[in-house]
């Protein structure tokens, strides 16, 4: 295999059926690509009770600073109905100028391109004046417990430090060069349970319908808006994601009702201040009687999900200007600096070094017939290669 060819790199990666949390041969393949370039490659198995064991990879070229990290994941989401695919999901077939396969854009394509980019850099200039590392997990599409966070802890414990990181997630909405992600909103989830009294639907006075109380509470969580956005972030937004009574009968008032919610929040809040605001709203709504006239206040219980994701924003000029300049040089486009979208493993990396995200076009990620334009693989490789040159020149003060 020619390591400098992103198309060949990606085809080989797609053919590894690494549906989370399976390694599927993808990390072994990366080992064979990176070791000949001089990278010291280590495989790290992470474990935690109640979760699948996950294998991860850390590879470093060089021993001195400045130190640039590329981060990503080789695990992919399930393919769904394989019969619905026009090309087998692990075939890496090319048709109409596009390569088909699960993980093509999310995010084996980004990994394939950065491998090609550093291989080209070494071929032209030799090893960088500093260090480059790959931090690759097999647990990004899963619970994200035995992946990037534990790999970072492991690496930091052995003395690894980094000056900047690029995560190769598919950040572009429409065309390559559209967008760099320089931050992410936080994410907080919880589950509310309201206890009632079960009874016959024809005799509501003999029961206490918990759905009425739950509606009061969830309405208070969605109205009014938590904020109207900030200079760098969209407005915080709460969505009720499940409602359940455990009751299939239409003539029975249920004994309890439960609702789960998720809020994506901006830098107006922390997870702690947001929890306090949610409790304040729930307590106020519990005492209202619009949906429960002549009833006692709603009794509710709230359970918070573990590990909220905290909001972050990167303002590192060397990192952002080097990447933005590389994109403009290669594509002629000035990328938008954005904080939109969901969470990513950048939320873990931001505690160790400045981090941004840039990869392929994400229109088909997680979909049937996930695919990438072959031409985009070459373009992204050129962007990454130019970025590597610019970042090390900037970091060295040249």
From Swiss-Prot:
Binding, Zn(2+) 1: 73, 106, 169
Keyword flag Thylakoid: no
Active site residues per record: 75, 140 (proton acceptor)
Catalysed transformations (reactions): N-succinyl-(2S,6S)-2,6-diaminopimelate + H2O = (2S,6S)-2,6-diaminopimelate + succinate
Keyword check for Amino-acid biosynthesis: yes
CDD domains given in the database record: M20_DapE_proteobac
EC code(s) of this entry: 3.5.1.18
Cofactor comment: Binds 2 Zn(2+) or Co(2+) ions per subunit.
Metabolic or biological pathway, per its Swiss-Prot or TrEMBL entry: Amino-acid biosynthesis; L-lysine biosynthesis via DAP pathway; LL-2,6-diaminopimelate from (S)-tetrahydrodipicolinate (succinylase route): step 3/3
GO MF term set: acetylornithine deacetylase activity; cobalt ion binding; succinyl-diaminopimelate desuccinylase activity; zinc ion binding
GO biological process, one term: lysine biosynthetic process via diaminopimelate
HAMAP family reported for this sequence: DapE (MF_01690)
Family the UniProt entry places it in: Belongs to the peptidase M20A family. DapE subfamily.
Name of the protein: Succinyl-diaminopimelate desuccinylase
Gene that encodes the chain: dapE
């Amino acid at each position: 295999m020619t390591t400098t060819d992103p198309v060949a790199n990606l085809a080989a990666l797609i053919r590894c059926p690494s549906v989370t949390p399976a390694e599927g041969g993808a990390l072994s393949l990366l080992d064979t690509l990176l070791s000949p370039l001089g990278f010291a490659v280590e495989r790290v198995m992470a474990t935690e009770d109640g979760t699948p064991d996950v294998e991860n990879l850390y590879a470093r070229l060089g021993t001195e600073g400045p130190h640039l990290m590329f981060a990503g994941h080789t695990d992919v989401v399930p393919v769904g109905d394989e019969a619905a695919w026009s090309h087998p999901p692990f075939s890496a077939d090319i048709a109409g100028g596009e390569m088909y396969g699960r993980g093509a854009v999310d995010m084996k394509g980004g990994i394939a391109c950065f491998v090609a980019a550093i291989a080209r850099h070494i071929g032209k200039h030799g090893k960088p004046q500093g260090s480059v590392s790959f931090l690759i997990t097999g647990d990004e599409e899963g619970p994200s417990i035995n992946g990037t966070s534990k790999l970072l802890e492991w690496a930091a414990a052995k003395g690894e430090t980094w000056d900047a990181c690029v995560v190769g997630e598919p950040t572009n909405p429409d065309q390559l060069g559209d967008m760099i992600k320089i931050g992410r909103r936080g994410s907080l989830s919880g589950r509310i349970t309201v206890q009632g009294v079960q009874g016959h639907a024809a005799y509501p006075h003999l029961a206490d319908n918990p759905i009425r109380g739950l509606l009061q509470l969830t309405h208070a969580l969605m109205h009014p808006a938590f904020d109207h956005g900030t200079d760098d972030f969209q407005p915080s937004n709460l969505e009720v994601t499940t409602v359940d009574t455990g009751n299939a009968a239409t003539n029975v008032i249920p004994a309890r009702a439960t609702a789960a919610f998720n809020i994506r929040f901006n830098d107006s809040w922390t997870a702690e201040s947001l929890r306090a605001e949610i409790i304040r709203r729930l307590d106020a709504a519990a005492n209202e009687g619009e949906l429960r006239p002549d009833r006692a206040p709603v009794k509710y219980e709230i359970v918070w999900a573990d590990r909220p994701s905290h909001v972050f924003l990167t303002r590192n000029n060397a990192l952002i200007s080097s990447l933005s300049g590389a994109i403009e040089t290669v594509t002629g486009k000035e990328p938008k600096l954005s904080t939109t979208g969901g969470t990513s493993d950048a939320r873990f990396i931001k505690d160790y070094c400045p981090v941004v995200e840039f990869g392929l076009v994400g229109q088909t990620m997680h979909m049937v017939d996930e695919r990438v334009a072959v031409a985009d693989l070459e373009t992204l490789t050129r962007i990454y290669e130019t970025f590597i040159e610019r970042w090390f020149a900037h970091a060295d003060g040249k």
